[in-house]
Amino acid sequence: MRGERGRGRGRFGSRVGPNTGFRPFVPHIPFDFHVCEMAFPRVKPAPDDSSFSESLLKRNQDLAPSTAEQASILSLVTKINNVIDNLIVAPGNFEVQIEEVRQVGSYKKGTMSTGHNVADLVVILKILPTLEAVSALGIKVVETLRTQDPAEVLTMLTNETGFEISSADATVKILITTVPPNLRKLDPELHLDIKVLQSALAAIRHARWFEENASHSTVKVLIRLLKDLRSRFPGFEPLTPWILDLLGHYAVMNNPTRQPLALNVSYKRCLQMLAAGLFLPGSVGITDPCESGNFRVHTVMTLEQQDMVCYTAQTLVRILSHGGFRKILGLEGDASALATEMSTWDGVIVTPSEKAYEKPPERKEGEEDENQDIPEGAEEEESMETQE
């Protein structure tokens, strides 16, 4: 009976009973140079990164919304916000009771990019969110706006998350949710999907957390650059906007000195952490600060997606270390093939990393599941097979 004295992984061991047959899940911490920099004293001066820093700022300048875009989206958001505020204060005969309206998303956070002039508002209803109520609110808002300014051409479309109002060069998406006690009273046939409502409430929590913790300008610039990176490299597509927000904040602010790192250092650090397996199964990852229960944000991705993010980052880290930053940043033509095809940098050939995860073959009917006794907590750690 070897189970009496724990042989499991982890600092405290594990007490495995004779009939349990599983090990507790102990996440590992991927290597991050900036957390343990004192253990690696420099033997030569740091390389000159001024050209890389200039390129990052140039790319951010290219990606930032123009003055005209900012003015048009601000104007539309302000008008819609005022109309909804008036409905809250003085609804009159209007039956759709509103609790509050909040700005969320990249508009609120200051991480919008040019060419995507879309802002998000969350409207919290006091009543149950029926499709009729959503449509009535959308019609009421757009008709009020048209009355205020008949010359402005506006369109209103309802969708599964609420509705959106568009002018010639800006769009405001209104995400509908309800007060939390109403979530228990929903009828799937009459009301908006509960996942949509919960997602809108989460967006409010995200915006509030960002405002309190991630308002540093370096964090905002880095997030805009990461969103651009995600849009140009298919391997990063699984990274959600919220994951990118948290990754950007972590890379800039999470270090022993608690002082924000420079943009060039933070950008490299993002790729280095992803390449080291920050978002792989078994990794401690980044805990969602807006959810309870130590939820690690990368677990929303499938195992294949987690592996794809890792091996894409590994390839880009190697290219970055050999001076290929202009190509990675999108300053020198299309770079989407960089992560999948061999490239040469100053005589050094960089071969793309290969995937490590192989999807297990589907079981035929009647076959028993060998892992059926493994509890849920240990599943993730056991389920990623690697090819040595």
Curated annotation (Swiss-Prot):
Assigned keywords, A-Z: Activator, DNA-binding, Nucleus, Transcription, Transcription regulation
Pfam short name (any one): DZF_C
Positions with biased composition (Acidic residues): 367-388
PROSITE patterns: DZF
Region: Disordered, residue numbers: 349-388
Subunit details: Forms heterodimers with ILF3.
Protein name: Interleukin enhancer-binding factor 2 homolog
Originating gene: ilf2
